């Protein structure tokens, strides 16, 4: 997997590497952390009545929800205090997008890795938990759960098994060698 740096963001989201604030676990690898700090300060000051409006100008809400769902699904045991990336174009109203990284500590303990209560200040989980205070955001989370975990969703057992088998087949010869 490519490291989700400013170059990564530029390649997949458009623009140039230097157009981006790219963070590795809250530290700038491209650009600055100014907007990140501003966003977190506003999140701390927000109320249930204004949190979605306040943070939606900084965060791609569906991306944040999906990012959190993936970490919950896998019970990521090596996350939220580190092993995450976020990037946004450095311009007004540009939104942070979140990227999983170094997630080898997932799917290890199906019965004991409930990560739904993770809430660390200055990390993605804090933003998510602040947003959960709003009923409309909770409904949006439920819609994303429905999309990904039911029907033909990406995280249904059938779709996940198909994806894992495809990946296993791609690396089989390299592992055998």
Predicted region positions:
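Predominantly extracellular/lumenal beta-strand repeat domains
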Residues: 12-13, 19-24, 50-53, 86-88, ...
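Mixed-charge, polar/low-complexity N-terminal
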Residues: 49, 54, 60-61, 78, ...
